[in-house]
Amino acid sequence: MADPKGSTSKDGLDDWCIVEAECSDIENDLEELFDRDTDSDISELLDDNDDLDQGNSRELFHQQESKESEEHLQKLKRKYLSPQAIAQLSPRLESITLSPQQKSKRRLFAEQDSGLELTLTNEAEDVSSEVEVPALDSQPVAEAQIGTVDIHYTELLRASNNKAILMAKFKEAFGVGFNDLTRQFKSYKTCCNHWVLSVYAVHDDLLESSKKLLQQHCDYVWIRGIAAMSLFLLCFKVGKNRGTVHKLMTSMLNVHEKQILSEPPKLRNVAAALFWYKGAMGSGTFTYGPYPDWMAHQTIVGHQSTEANAFDMSVMVQWAFDNNYLDEADIAYQYAKLAPEDSNAVAWLAHNNQARFVRECASMVRFYKKGQMKEMSMSEWIHTRITEVEGEGHWSTIAKFLRYQQVNFIMFLAALKDMLHSVPKRNCILIYGPPNTGKSAFTMSLIRVLRGRVLSFVNSKSQFWLQPMSECKIALIDDVTDPCWLYMDTYLRNGLDGHYVSLDCKHKAPIQTKFPALLLTSNINVHNEITYRYLHSRIKGFEFPNPFPMKADNTPEFELTDQSWKSFFTRLWNQLELSDQEDEGDNGESQRPFQCSARSANEHL
């Protein structure tokens, strides 16, 4: 029979090896084991109470979420904010503080914590001494690949004052302030031919295309781009306001209006002119067209305006005399417009006594014109006036109108001849008739072409109301009424006779003069008034009984223009017995124009 499986006890092995476990009564007694659990070191590990407290789980969840959010925030700060922002801005600024800095004290006892809260606290204390300022130019690597245009838009969106940001970047790029090159226009409707524009974040392709497109709008173009800023100096062919310029540039460069700074340039600043002049010589600057006059005046040696010319009053008087400017406002405005072309006008604008020069110039021109008029005969005066009339007309218009008013043309021509030659008691013509018959239109057209004067009886209370009669060759008193007829019958009989009278003029003693040729219009036929019988022989009257005819389009049937009177005097020159101009010039005198300006010693004759 075989041996049973398993281990067999052999001699000598049971002395040192425990083959079987010894049984204990205590371990087998489970009840006794549970009874002794109160004496254990881990007592109250299990709560046998049946009542369980829920606890504030929502507050615990909120605390955990707050910790996670704070961790994410600290990671972002360490990633995007530069701790050396102040040192990068200025090393000296970092050392300047408003309050004394205190060194952190060492802790006497090390804090015991799980690690997270204590670490965050220490990091906050270490960074609190430096101010974290986000740099506008700092961008993450991933965002920098999007494009510089998007970065520039982001900078403008982050800025609270767009204009200040643009001006700061302009000065950083070009080294000068934008206001140092420009003068301010507050209104968007003020027009100017010259504009300076600083445009931010323009695409390179659009900037290159604008160099060609602007040539059709401007006489001079100056363009330069540095970094994100582009500077334009545009001299437009016609004046434009700021709104029009912005509309043109936004459509051409595909930019927003907030990206544009626009002001007119300083035209009288040498430093600003030198900036544009020297900048045009740089390799990075595009220019088109000749230099503007205001730039050339201040930069180019030998230019006419660079010479320090003193103001010459005689040149201004000669200019006003040649252009027939007698009014002070016309002289001041027109001479100021002449400044870009005349150095004497520039000197006048730079003078402190502009108003005094204008008054004196107007007075001198009136003196010269009055002296010239007195020297001329009536024939020479008429010839001079009709020579200045441009265009051609036909004298038959006047003849037809007189025939329409049932006026004998031969008798009117004879009366006009006597009036122009100042025949005694034939020196005045009266046109009378009902209202709206063309009396004033007829006489006013003659006064206009012969440069006569109009007197108004409304000023008769002044003793100087007849003063214009001493400054003209022909005068008109329109719409004479009974008070005016009474005044003429009382005071003006000698004047209507063609004799010398004493005429009181303002700011001077009474002068001895004769009345010029006088035209009157009235609704009263003075020849039918017995009260004014002493005026009958002194006035030649013609009646206009018919209403003035008008066309369907409300235009006059008879056009009494300067050209019509020019043709009238030219055609009837001999019938009016006006002297020939060639006969008046046979005395051998030179027919040179009047010269009232001072000549230089070396000027050619």
Swiss-Prot record:
EC number per UniProt: 5.6.2.4
Catalytic reaction list: Couples ATP hydrolysis with the unwinding of duplex DNA by translocating in the 3'-5' direction; ATP + H2O = ADP + phosphate + H(+)
One Pfam family in the UniProt entry: PPV_E1_N
Post-translational modification: Phosphorylated. Sumoylated.
GO MF entries: ATP binding; ATP hydrolysis activity; DNA binding; DNA helicase activity
Domain named SF3 helicase: residues: 407-557
Biological processes annotated in GO: DNA replication
Motif Nuclear export signal, chain ranges: 89-98
Superkingdom of origin: Viruses
Covalent crosslink: Glycyl lysine isopeptide (Lys-Gly) (interchain with G-Cter in SUMO): 514
Renumbered residue ranges of the record's region Disordered: 580-605
Region (DNA-binding region), start-end ranges: 145-308
Keywords on record: ATP-binding, DNA replication, DNA-binding, Early protein, Helicase, Host nucleus, Hydrolase, Isomerase, Isopeptide bond, Nucleotide-binding, Phosphoprotein, Ubl conjugation
Biased composition regions of type Polar residues, renumbered to the chain: 588-605
Motif (Nuclear localization signal): 77-79
CC annotations in GO: host cell nucleus
Subunit structure: Can form hexamers. Interacts with E2 protein; this interaction increases E1 DNA binding specificity. Interacts with host DNA polymerase subunit POLA2. Interacts with host single stranded DNA-binding protein RPA1. Interacts with host TOP1; this interaction stimulates the enzymatic activity of TOP1.
Function, as annotated: ATP-dependent DNA 3'-5' helicase required for initiation of viral DNA replication. It forms a complex with the viral E2 protein. The E1-E2 complex binds to the replication origin which contains binding sites for both proteins. During the initial step, a dimer of E1 interacts with a dimer of protein E2 leading to a complex that binds the viral origin of replication with high specificity. Then, a second dimer of E1 displaces the E2 dimer in an ATP-dependent manner to form the E1 tetramer.
Protein name per UniProt: Replication protein E1
Gene source species: Human papillomavirus 14
Lineage of the species this protein comes from: Viruses, Monodnaviria, Shotokuvirae, Cossaviricota, Papovaviricetes
Gene encoding the protein: E1
